[in-house]
Amino acid sequence: MRTVKSYVGYAIKSRQILFGVSNIVGAYGKKMPTVVIYDANIGESSKDKLLTFTNKNGIESFSLCVEDIYPDKNCKAIGVIDKNLATAIINRIRSLQNE
């Protein structure tokens, strides 16, 4: 999980991240996230809205504890825009799930 946290930190520093369901769902064009990480405690309507958006646009989404990844911000969903960072995050989360 520490590696995922580091990748999210790089995305924050490079301004290649979206915070919150409304920002993620409202994204389009070059600002479209490649991967979305949402908290398990997210509200049902927000979760439905987020999953509908990710499924419609072919975006990978994972349910993790967002507070462990980014504790400084009270946020339930994170979208990573940078494709290379998103690919690294996807690969790391999948390897953690397979362990």
Language-model segments: which ranges?
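Short glycine-/polar-rich loops that comprise or flank the Walker A/P-loop
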Residues: M32-P33, I59, K73-N74
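Charged, alpha-helix-enriched surfaces in structured cytosolic catalytic cores
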Residues: T3, S45, N84, A88
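Short secondary-structure boundary segments
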Residues: A40
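Positively charged, polar, low-complexity stretches
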Residues: V21-G26, S45-P71, I93-Q97
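C-terminal structural segments of small proteins and small subunits
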Residues: E67-E99
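N-terminal first-folded block
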Residues: T3-V35
